[in-house]
Amino acid sequence: YSIISITDQKLKEEIAEIANQPYIPNAGHLFVFVVDQRRNTLIAEAKGAEALVQGSPERFISAFSDAMIAAQNMVVAAESLGMGTVYLGSILNDNAKLSELLKLPKYVYPAVGLAVGWPDQEPQLKPRLPRHVIHMENYYQDLENPLEELKDYDAEVHEYYDLRDLNKRVDEFTTQIAKTMD
């Protein structure tokens, strides 16, 4: 992985447009974590080896996981200092445009954005999925009736969005999922 610090205000504004997140230009620090197989390719080639694995799904998943772990470590470090953080998965709304803006070469892909700064307010914690939905024992288990099992969670998420001051929307978790899968 590699980390790109976004310090150019115009670039922050363009990323905010891609992500549909108007607060991004005001973030104290903006980072984009990228899957970086280019560096490994250049190293392999410099050593005279053929870089054949950079396009494999396994290598991509491993490198993507590394980028996400690095982002989480930055969150832990920032929060230990009293700073606030916001993951920005929405930077991937237009992956091609973001890659062009960041001048990402072949074998480098955006993974996640991260805004870090001193919070103006103490935000309400976003509701988490119920434990029985995300934690299983021994084997994968489908939800028997997803809409019924997530009914209470939908109500919590709806209330969470309704009470927000910024980026207010009336939405439910299951509706968000359906929209992204359509």
Predicted region positions:
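Acidic, surface-exposed loops and disordered segments
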Residues: 1-182
